A protein has these predicted regions:
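Nucleic-acid enzyme cleavage-core boundary/entry regions
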Residues: 87-340, 347-463
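Ubiquitin system architectures
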Residues: 1-91
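Broad hydrophobic/π-residue packing in well-ordered secondary structure
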Residues: 53, 67, 205-206, 341-343
């Protein structure tokens, strides 16, 4: 019986696919056919590519027989992506310690339910004592979340909350109402912490519509209570609806259940809002790829890009919610993995990357629990549009609003501290053109996974 099998080999090393058919001995290791491929495709270095079958990288020491190839098999050859540059930035990863933060800024922490409840009870008891001893001056002292109390710190490279306070006291009818609302909220939060149950912000509002009057009021009170207690909002067991998803080479426990993110299909695994329920993270990935849009995420998931280049892929489907940001930070802290960002080449894509990187003003008191200050901007860079020959019909003229946002962004301290960001934004403004990630699919829907990302990562072409 013949040991020969027929291999249809697709060359994905270039932007244009080429194919060839080879007859090989099923008992010969794959490495033995590299010389033939070298001759067929004129590949200069035989160690410059890898074999893939069913989207997974193959061990070249094994034979087709060991790999259970059919008599007629289709395999791909792709660039062997060097992770040398990724390894280099991994050595340079930095997480600020307590001593790195400026004196007086508000830094909150994730705390378990019992410790958060203890702080809440102590704060409530202190307020009761105040009302008994000096009722006219009894007040809740809450760190102010006003814009003038928020600033960018160049040392930690984060947006932080200062130590200015606002006073909620029995001094007018309006302040009496706000104190009553805070007291009611504290009672509701105490009940759920005691049972270690989670609720949404909307649930909290509907627990007492008459006193809160509007959900925006209860939402703000929740943030005020968290910062007053020195804990994250998640520590109050109050969560918001989430939209983030993850796929790739990571598994973890969620409420005790084992989650394997390589088996989540194209749709990925929804990121739970209950980040405190995620434990025992394990991964053989080399980096995290944060993607702006779900469409790009689905392309990466369907092509199983993480099997080709070992990574974890996450999207917040646009502007990320708290849970997505906290999940990215959790991976960064627990697994010590570099994070690369893939966004649209426009001011709003950069604004999303900025939120992942330095935090947002609205949640400045939680920046340390959500921001990853050393994220690298992998793409889509404005300079990539010419470098990767994105045609003019796939580029979009910037609107006056786009230009104004870009001009404002270039003046920000965060951007000024990153010269390459300045260069890329200036290039965008000078050409007056922007582009979406989907522009990479102008000729081939797999161009991003087969060519663009492998070459960007291989060469370390990030900002």
């Amino acid at each position: 019986m013949s040991n020969m099998i027929s291999l249809l080999i697709k060359n994905k090393l270039d932007t244009k696919d080429t194919t060839t058919t080879l007859k090989i001995d099923s008992k010969s290791p794959l490495a033995a056919i590299k010389e033939k491929l070298h001759e067929e495709f004129s590949i200069p270095k035989k160690n410059s590519f890898v074999f893939l079958f069913n989207k997974k990288v193959l061990d070249e020491k094994k034979t087709p027989e060991e790999l259970k190839f059919p008599k007629k098999a289709e395999i791909e050859i792709k660039l062997r992506v060097s992770l040398r540059n990724v390894m280099q930035i991994k050595k340079e990863l930095y997480l600020p310690s307590e001593t790195d933060f400026p004196y007086g800024v508000i830094i909150v922490e994730n705390k378990p339910a019992e410790l958060t409840r203890k702080r809440l009870i102590e704060t409530a008891a202190d307020f009761v004592v105040q009302t008994m001893q000096d009722p006219k001056n009894a007040a809740f002292k809450i760190p102010s979340r006003a814009s003038e109390n928020i600033g960018y710190d160049d040392n930690t490279k984060m947006v932080l909350l200062g130590n200015q306070q606002m006073i909620r006291a029995y001094r007018s009818l309006s302040s009496v109402l706000s104190v009553a609302q805070m007291a009611r909220l504290m009672k509701l939060i105490d009940e759920q912490l005691n049972k270690n149950l989670h609720t949404t912000k909307r649930d909290v509002y509907y627990r007492d519509v008459n006193i809160f009057r509007d959900q925006s009021i209860s939402d703000n009170l929740i943030e005020d209570l968290a910062v007053m207690l020195g804990v994250t909002r998640a520590s109050l067991n109050v969560v918001a609806s989430t939209k983030g998803i993850v796929v790739g080479r990571i598994n973890f426990r969620e409420s005790g259940d084992l989650i394997d993110c390589t088996k989540m299909g194209v749709g990925g695994k929804a990121i739970t809002p209950m980040i405190d329920q995620i434990t025992k993270l394990d991964s053989d990935a080399e980096f995290v790829l944060v993607v702006e849009k779900e469409a790009a995420f689905m392309r990466l998931a369907e092509d199983r890009f993480y099997d080709y280049v070992p990574c974890i892929i996450i999207t917040g489907k646009g502007q990320p919610d708290m849970a997505t940001r906290m999940f990215v930070k959790l991976i960064r802290k627990e697994l010590n993995l570099p994070v690369l960002g893939l966004m649209d080449a426009d001011p709003y894509g950069l604004d999303i990357l900025r939120v992942y990187t330095i935090g947002s003003k609205s949640l400045s008191f939680e920046t340390n629990e959500m921001a990853v200050s050393d994220i690298k901007w992998l793409g889509l860079l404005p300079s990539d549009l010419d470098e990767y020959k994105i045609p003019n019909n796939c580029r979009i003229p910037m609107s006056p609003r786009d230009k104004k946002r870009g001009e404002d962004m270039i003046k920000e301290e965060f951007v000024q501290a990153r010269p390459r960001w300045v260069e890329e934004i200036e290039l965008m403004l000078s050409t007056g053109m922007k582009a979406e990630i989907q522009a990479l699919a102008h000729e081939d829907i797999q161009f991003m996974t087969n060519f663009y990302l492998p070459h960007k990562i291989h060469s370390g072409d990030w900002v």
